[in-house]
Amino acid sequence: MAGYLIGVTIFDLQEFILLVFGGFLVTGSANGFNQCLEQEYDALMERTRLRPIPQKRISSINAVLFSFVIGFLGFYLLSLIKPHGSFYGFLSKSSAFGLLSLMIYVLSYTPLKRMSTVSIFIGAIPGAIPVLLGWVAATDDFGLAVGVLFAIQFLWQFPHFISISWIRDDEYKKAGFKMMYGGKKGVYPALLAFITSIF
């Protein structure tokens, strides 16, 4: 929403509503698929053990179906925003960025969390895409301003990642996640968190 409100010159309520609900549904879909893939690890961690799938409040297949349906609805709503700026006559730029965000989050970030600390850099990309998606929904274009907004949003996530891995280190190790600076509470991670937070 912030990207839209910063980039828009003439506010369009219908466009804004499509963006809010489309973005909400695509984000929910990505989170749903993530929880389907990580259900056995979520059950091992205090922070995530009460999620619906580990608690058996919803079956895996129903969670996948629900995630697919809301993702499809989200992409449909986003595809209605400036459809004349579509890729190959199918995806609007807004829906293309929504799809890119979901794909990176589910297919790259989620599996990489158990393989390498590189995952936090990958995970910061879909975390920063919403501001880009909002800007493109407002302007149907790119530029230096949105690049700066994307970079700020990208960098602001590192204090978040570092602080969680610092506090929840034992839980992440138990579940097999390789979080950045887990168990290494020194000057370097604290300095990196501080520097990236002032941008």
Regions found by a protein language model. Give the residues of each.
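Membrane-interface helix caps and helix-loop-helix hairpins in membrane proteins
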Residues: L80-S92, T110-V118, W135-D141
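Interhelical loop and helix-boundary elements at the membrane-water interface
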Residues: P52-A63, L107-P126, M179-L192
